[in-house]
From Swiss-Prot:
In MsbA the ATP-binding domain (NBD) and the transmembrane domain (TMD) are fused. It comes from Xanthomonas axonopodis pv. citri (strain 306). It comes from the Bacteria. Involved in lipopolysaccharide (LPS) biosynthesis. Translocates lipid A-core from the inner to the outer leaflet of the inner membrane. Transmembrane domains (TMD) form a pore in the inner membrane and the ATP-binding domain (NBD) is responsible for energy generation. It catalyses: ATP + H2O + lipid A-core oligosaccharideSide 1 = ADP + phosphate + lipid A-core oligosaccharideSide 2. Gene3D superfamilies: ABC transporter type 1, transmembrane domain, P-loop containing nucleotide triphosphate hydrolases. Residues 32-314 form the ABC transmembrane type-1 domain. It is found in: Cell inner membrane. SMART domains: AAA (SM00382). One of its GO terms (cellular component) is plasma membrane. This is ATP-dependent lipid A-core flippase. Keywords: ATP-binding, Cell inner membrane, Cell membrane, Lipid transport, Membrane, Nucleotide-binding, Translocase, Transmembrane, Transmembrane helix, Transport.
Length: 589
């Protein structure tokens, strides 16, 4: 019933990057503009370096007054053009990067909503949030921000090298002997960054998951005095994250020092060869200054090109995590049988379902029929398979064997959207979204429901008595996860949502298990208004609430061990009678 989420299989950096660049295609005009501007910016840098010769020779050696007058103007114009080009590059690249991050978030979010329910059992939500958050940002950095640095610095290095070749090819070729060593260093740095980046991403997800678990359960943590234990666990994860981060810093520090050392060797070689050229009369002071300033421009450029490998490799690691989601198979949805409104005939035929890694099945050879308009109660001890059974009907999970039929057709024969339109669900844990009461009741495909139907649904769910007392009525905000409302109020809004949907199949998953007596009475009254003329499946904890069910299925260890009406099962004196007797004695006590 579930699938495992494995670490993405390693693929080549170029293959991942090429796939990533496909997301940049819609912004190619922006990127072309950025490239042209980057070329102009690099040309501006090279032009400034070229001016070092007339500045030195004409101003300080030959005392040329005319050159001294126009050089400052040239420098100002050069930097104005360079500044405008740099601004265009930054804006175009920035817009592209942020747009790619947005597109990735939307695409991955849409993909998550198409994945089977088993995915949400095997991947924690904090891991999903990491993918939608920092992973998307780092991918955008790899796709565009890193490219910006690489283009800018590469063009500046190429421009400076070209200028050096123009002024002295002998000096330049002497320095280029060091290029293979530099390429080897950059390759080693890239490999190490990529290896560490995968671990850092996983460590960040584990940190977020641990914080989510602890903070979401803060009451339990405090009442059981688990603050120290949880802090030790979180601290251990934070320390691991720190160790990985320090590996990145160590790699950056070593690579920077190595590049600087190679640069120093190159600079020393330049001084030695240039000195010999000058003594031979083949190099002027201006030529030497151009060579020196060009070399001083190349060294920080090479340093940035080495350091950008961290950004690239972290982005590629994030891209692989995102692509592993995008490459996951969607929920199977090949149904073609048309379905407008079902009659509500539900049939299970020898259904078996199993969680991965489990020897015993969650459900084993389950068979029953729920006739249209009837109430089928499903009872049993915790872990007996009740929730697993009802999750198969809307195909949140798929059965391993057997068939589930709706109106005589396997549920797989219908399109998922059509199948789920036939089902309303009211669970024990009601999820409300941070919006108004009206938004939460008229939810999803019901968002355009007219005001009259909306009010009738809220009235029918016994919710109007508290909604009317709120300052903004139906437009009152419920807070995050409905935190401004009580449990009973949230439950009644869930019933109103189900009433507004008016689906032929109703699933109630322990809808009153966690309520006080008064709230339970109001909710039960609302449910009695909701259930007529629908096929209703009720998972019941309190057996007193299902005494009038048309049939009761008693489950134990994934099997239906008893079935019949409430009175028939009491007369049998089996498991149902035992559970009923226990609850009766508890109420008397």
């Amino acid at each position: 019933m579930t699938i495992s989420i494995d670490r993405p299989a390693p693929v080549s950096s170029w293959r991942t990057y090429r796939r990533l660049l496909a997301f940049a295609k819609p912004y190619r005009l922006l990127l072309v503009a950025a490239l042209i501007a980057a070329l102009i910016e690099a040309a501006g840098t090279t032009g400034f370096l070229a001016l070092m010769k007339p500045i030195t020779d004409e101003t300080f050696i030959y005392k040329n007054a005319e050159v001294s007058r126009w050089l400052p103007v040239q420098i100002i114009l050069l930097f104005v053009v360079r500044g405008v080009a740099g601004y265009i590059t930054d804006m175009a690249m920035g817009k592209s990067a942020r747009s790619i991050a947005r597109d990735l978030r939307i695409k991955v979010m849409a993909k998550y909503l198409r994945l089977p329910g088993s995915r949400f059992d095997s991947e924690p939500v904090p891991s999903m949030l990491i993918r939608l958050g920092s992973d998307s940002d780092q991918v955008a950095q790899a796709a565009v921000d890193a490219v910006k640095v690489m283009i800018q610095q590469s063009l500046q290095v190429i421009g400076a090298l070209a200028l050096m070749l123009w002024h002295s090819w002998q000096v330049t070729l002497t320095i280029l002997v060091l290029a293979p060593v530099l390429a080897w260093v950059m390759d080693k740095v890239a490999r190490r960054y990529r290896r560490i980046s995968h671990s850092i991403q996983e460590s960040g997800a584990q940190l977020l998951q641990a914080a989510d678990q602890t903070l979401s359960s803060h009451q339990e943590v405090k009442i059981y005095g688990a603050q120290q234990t949880e802090m030790e666990r979180y601290g251990a994860l934070a320390n691991r994250n720190l160790r990985l981060a320090m590996k990145v810093e160590s790699t950056r520090g070593i690579s920077t020092a190595t590049v600087q050392m190679i640069g120093a060797i190159g600079l020393s070689a330049l001084l030695f060869v240039a000195g010999a050229q000058a003594l031979a009369g083949r190099l002027t002071a201006g030529d030497f200054v151009v060579l020196m300033t060009s070399m001083l421009t190349i060294i920080p450029g090479l340093k940035q090109l080495t350091n950008v490998q961290n950004m690239v490799q972290r982005g590629l690691a994030s891209a692989e995590r995102l692509f592993s989601v995008l490459d996951s198979p969607d929920e199977p949805d090949q149904g073609t049988v048309p379905l407008t409104r079902a009659k509500g005939l539900i049939e299970f035929r020898d259904v078996t379902a199993r969680y991965p890694g489990q020897v015993n099945p969650a459900l084993a050879d389950v068979s029953f029929v729920a006739q249209p308009g009837t109430v089928t109660a499903i009872v049993g001890r915790s872990g007996s398979g009740k929730s697993s059974l009802i999750k198969l009907i809307p195909r949140f999970y798929e059965a391993e064997a057997g068939q589930i039929l709706l109106d005589g057709h396997p549920v797989q024969a219908y399109a998922l959207a059509d199948l789920r339109r036939q089902i309303a669900l009211v669970g024990q844990q009601v999820m409300l979204f941070d919006g108004s009461i009206a938004d939460n009741v008229a939810f999803g495909e019901m968002r355009n429901a007219d005001a009259g139907k909306l009010e009738r649904a809220i009235l029918g769910a016994n919710a109007m008595e508290f909604v009317a007392q709120l300052p903004e009525g139906l437009q009152s905000h419920v807070g995050t996860k409905g935190g401004r409302l009580s449990g009973g109020q949230r439950q009644r809004l869930a019933i109103a949502r189900a009433m507004l949907k008016d689906a032929p199949v109703l699933i109630l998953d322990e809808a009153t298990a966690a309520l006080d007596n008064e709230s339970e009475r109001l909710v039960q009254d609302a449910l009695h208004k909701l259930m007529p003329d629908r096929t209703t499946l009720v998972i019941a904890h309190r057996l007193s609430t299902i005494e009038h069910a048309d049939q009761v299925l008693v489950m134990d260890q994934g099997r239906i061990v008893e079935r019949g009406t409430h009175h028939q099962l009491l007369a049998q004196g089996g498991l149902y009678s035992h559970l009923h007797g226990m609850q009766f004695r508890e109420r008397q006590a």
